[in-house]
UniProtKB/Swiss-Prot annotation:
Residues 114-127 have a biased composition (Acidic residues). It comes from Arabidopsis thaliana (Mouse-ear cress). This is Protein GRAVITROPIC IN THE LIGHT 1. It comes from the Eukaryota. It holds the Pfam family DUF641.
Length: 559
């Protein structure tokens, strides 16, 4: 061993040369050295670990580590038997190969340094590879975050934008359709109403389909919860039309119930007023047939009489509804009747003292409807003798009477079959509309309406030039239309009929008067005078023949 050590420590010049030669030899020496005591150095050139090989290196190191250790231990046991044998082999090696021995020691040191560097390089490569993997994972997560935290693709976003554009377009179209619907209300235009309604329904269906499309888009990219929400939404969408139909049916049921109550009231009034008038009804029906056959030819007194009967029926119906509203509002009906009688007496020119002496209990409670009907008829027939009910100063009937009569009869034929509510919806400010507004405001004053309905909403609409679509106002329009048609017929006839009204306290004349109260034997007892007039009468003259429509009066015993 000592000669080998001495031979290895030569002069510096030779030592530097040896280092260079050793560096060259290291590049050509084999890679794997089994143990440091080996004599020959037969190895492959050293290799640097690549990043792609690190994974294979780690996997092999785990699986084959134990096997390699066992193999090397067996080889060591075979090669080295004892410590003395080892010393002899090393000494022989130094004597036989003095230069290679020094090179071997240097190579061993170099190899240890190289192994250390290689391990460090491998560790650095592993660290760099792990950093690269982390960076790649971070980039993937960033890309996923940019694409959408919920996994929304670019195509889905574009489709969402298209859906939103369609939603805004549908909303704008629905707004235009709603404006058209409002314009069709005032003035009332059924065709425009139908078109606007169809447009509104179409746009609503379009928005509903867009909503379902949006829900399907959300359901495809989400979990079961959104699918369940979409299912519930589709169920609500399917049930919604049926719920709307049920609501409409409920409204119709309420309307029908109200109509039934009104018809019951009409039947009650008709049965009380016409208890034994079966024969009279047959005569009226025959008159109605005759009038309908002659309506398109020319105005005749029979047509006027038939229209007057319609006025009586309409006034009874409206009076019954108004009286029921008063009772529902807990009015003092007796006080209201006294107030009506006082107003009737003052219009007839009676003094308050003379009226007060006879007004006590003159009208029983069951006859209060006659006093209320008297009040209504007096208000609505006021100004009947003028061609426009004194709403303006027109004198067309005097300037061109023949043309005016033809125009009035043409208006009568046009208006007879029309619904007054629809007519006023189309032409709210026509002459008939102005007549309805004026008469309603004179019959139903503000305090009365507030007491009956709790507010004055209908009155405010009428003052503004509109016409409410309520049941009460509809009943009033029925009476107003009947009086307006009677007025048109009156100015269509030549000569025009003259109307008259019985004064309070006047004696009863069966030729000109008709009692609203039915007596037991069908005849009016002696000593009855007019308590107050209920409805005016008319005197007709046509082609030398005259007829009279009797005035309806409420009779009381002479005081």
């Amino acid at each position: 061993m000592l000669p080998g050590i001495l031979l290895c420590s030569l002069n510096p010049r030779n030592h530097s040369k040896k280092k260079k030669s050793e560096r060259e030899s290291l590049e050509t020496e084999p890679k794997d050295i089994d143990y440091w005591y080996s004599v020959q150095f037969n190895r492959d050139p050293p290799r640097f670990a690549l990043k792609s090989e690190n994974n294979n290196h780690h996997s092999r190191s785990k699986s084959g580590g134990d096997f390699c250790k066992k193999k090397k231990r067996g080889e060591m046991a075979n090669k080295v038997s004892n410590f003395s044998d080892l010393i002899q082999r090393v000494t022989a090696s130094c004597l036989l190969h003095p230069l290679s021995a020094g090179r071997q020691d240097l190579a061993v040191n170099r190899r240890e340094e190289y192994d250390t560097e290689e391990e460090e390089n491998e560790e650095e490569g592993e660290i760099q590879y792990e950093d690269a993997l982390e960076k790649e994972n971070g980039k993937d997560e960033t890309i996923r975050a940019k694409n959408g935290r919920n996994g929304v693709s670019v195509e889905t976003v574009q489709e969402m934008e298209m859906v939103m554009d369609e939603v805004f377009t549908a909303a704008a179209a629905m707004k235009r359709a709603y404006v058209a619907l409002q314009e069709a209300h005032s003035p009332w235009d059924p065709e425009k109403m139908h078109d606007a309604d169809m447009a509104m329904v179409a746009e609503l269906r379009r928005i509903g389909s867009l909503r379902e499309r949006f829900r399907r888009m959300r359901g495809t990219g989400s979990g079961g919860r959104r699918k369940n929400d979409a299912g519930r939404g589709m169920l609500r969408e399917a049930v919604a039309p049926y719920e709307a139909v049920v609501k409409e049916l409920k409204k119709e049921v309420k309307v029908k119930d109200t109509e039934i109550e009104n018809l019951k009231e009409k039947v009650k009034v008709a049965s009380m007023a016409n208890g034994n008038g079966g024969k009279k009804h047959r005569l009226l029906s025959s008159r109605k047939v005759n009038c309908t056959t002659q309506i398109a030819v020319s105005p005749v007194p029979e047509l006027f009489e038939m229209t007057m009967i319609q006025v009586k029926e309409a006034s009874k119906s409206f009076t019954g509804i108004l009286l029921s509203l008063m009772r529902a509002a807990h009015w003092d009906i007796a006080a209201a009747v006294r107030s009506i009688e006082a107003a009737s007496a003052s219009s007839d020119g009676m003094s308050a003292s003379s009226f007060a002496s006879s007004v006590q209990s003159s009208v029983p409670n069951q006859h209060a409807k006659f006093a209320l009907e008297s009040y209504i008829c007096r208000k609505i027939f006021q100004g009947f003798d003028h061609e426009t009910f004194y709403m303006d100063g027109s004198l067309s009937s005097l300037i061109n009477p023949d043309q005016y009569r033809r125009d009035c009869f043409a208006q009568f034929k046009d208006m007879k079959a029309m619904d007054p509510m629809e007519l006023l919806g189309i032409l709210p400010t026509c002459h008939f509309g102005k007549f309805c507004s004026k008469k309603y405001l004179s019959i139903i004053h503000q305090k009365m309406e507030e007491s009956l309905f709790g507010d004055s909403e209908q009155r405010e609409l009428v003052v503004a030039g509109n016409h409410p679509r309520s049941q009460f106002y509809g009943e009033f329009l029925g009476l107003a239309k009947a009086v307006w048609l009677l007025h048109l017929l009156a100015f269509s006839l030549d000569p025009s009929p003259s109307h008259f009204e019985a004064n309070r306290g006047a004696e009863f004349h069966s030729q000109y008067m008709e009692s609203v109260v039915r007596f037991s034997d069908g005849r009016v007892p002696a000593g009855q005078v007019v308590g107050f007039p209920v409805c005016p009468g008319f005197k007709l003259s046509h082609q030398g023949k005259g007829s009279i429509i009797k005035s309806r009066v409420y009779l009381v015993p002479r005081a």
